[in-house]
């Protein structure tokens, strides 16, 4: 996957290129990330990248000319078919379904705003989609861009050691993930559930599915409203609720 990022702080993206799953993907050639800094496209000796908004008010906007030139440079490098995304609190909220959709694109250009945002005409003429990571205020689009890159890259074939890792992640099937355990078998008197030590793969599968359903019901019940549960899932969830009520 090819990724281009428009940012005033390209150094921040070393967190993506140098560390963890994404860093390994870059090293292995599965992920290619380039940055364009609007400061490199300025024409004054101060490298000015902000400007006053028409109509007054607090704060500044990103200056149009350097930003637009940076986007054009990224588009030229990406070639035909690249999708331009602006990280914005007004955008569609990123969820696993959205991540899956974005992962279908082989080339993405991410525009990271700063200050009070960017000129609306840039959004109208240069941006294909706006995406948000949540209803809260951040200082810029870099952290949302890194969040998007991390989540999307996990779905690129070969990035994870095992594809099952992505398939079993929380939200991959609309449910929260089940609890996980490692050694020791007993920790401060709390034992690993016996079924996980049984070696019975079908029973382990059913337990994990039931725990995912139950955890989703308890922590994010609204997610279940969007799912068409199978007969197996419905039965497992009913058993979970029955057991929970029994010991309540």
From Swiss-Prot:
Catalysed conversion reaction: guanosine(37) in tRNA + S-adenosyl-L-methionine = N(1)-methylguanosine(37) in tRNA + S-adenosyl-L-homocysteine + H(+)
Which InterPro entries does the UniProt record give? Alpha/beta_knot_MTases, tRNA_m1G_MeTrfase_C_sf, tRNA_m1G_MeTrfase_TrmD, tRNA_m1G_MTases_N, tRNA_MeTrfase_TRMD/TRM10
Could you tell me the Gene Ontology terms of the biological process aspect for this record?
tRNA N1-guanine methylation
Which top-level group of life is the source organism from? Bacteria
State which Enzyme Commission number(s) the record gives: 2.1.1.228
Q: What is its main location?
A: cytoplasm
Does the keyword Transferase feature in the UniProt annotation?
yes
Q: Which UniProt keywords apply?
A: Cytoplasm, Methyltransferase, S-adenosyl-L-methionine, Transferase, tRNA processing
Where does this one sit in the cell? Cytoplasm
State the top-level EC class. transferase
* Residue sites binding S-adenosyl-L-methionine per the record: 113, 133-138
Q: Which family would the database say this protein is a member of?
A: Belongs to the RNA methyltransferase TrmD family.
Enumerate the NCBIfam families for this protein: PRK00026.1 (NF000648), trmD (TIGR00088)
Tell me the subunit arrangement: Homodimer.
Functional note = Specifically methylates guanosine-37 in various tRNAs.
**What is the protein named?**
tRNA (guanine-N(1)-)-methyltransferase
């Amino acid at each position: 996957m090819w990724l281009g990022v428009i940012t005033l702080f390209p150094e921040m993206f070393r967190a993506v290129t140098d560390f963890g799953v994404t860093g390994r993907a870059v090293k292995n050639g599965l992920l290619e990330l380039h940055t364009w800094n609007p400061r490199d496209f300025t024409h004054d000796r101060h490298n000015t990248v902000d400007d006053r908004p028409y109509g007054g008010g607090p704060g500044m906007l990103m200056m149009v000319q350097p930003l637009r030139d940076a986007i054009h440079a990224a588009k030229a490098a990406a070639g035909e078919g690249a999708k331009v995304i602006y990280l914005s609190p007004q955008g569609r909220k990123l969820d696993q379904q959205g991540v899956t959709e974005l992962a279908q694109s082989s080339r993405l250009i991410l525009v990271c705003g700063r200050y009070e945002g960017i000129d609306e005409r840039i959004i109208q003429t240069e941006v294909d989609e706006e995406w948000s990571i949540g209803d809260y205020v951040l200082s810029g689009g870099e952290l949302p861009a890194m969040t998007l890159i991390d989540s999307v890259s996990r779905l690129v074939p070969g990035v994870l050691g095992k594809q099952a890792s992505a398939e079993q992640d929380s939200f991959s099937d609309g449910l929260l993930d089940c609890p996980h355990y490692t050694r020791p078998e007993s920790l401060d008197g709390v034992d690993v559930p016996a079924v996980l030590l049984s070696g019975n793969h079908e029973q382990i599968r059913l337990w994990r599915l039931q725990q995912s359903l139950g955890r989703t019901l308890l922590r994010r019940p609204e997610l279940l409203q969007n799912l068409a549960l199978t007969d197996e899932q419905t039965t497992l969830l009913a058993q979970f609720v029955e057991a929970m009520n029994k010991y309540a």
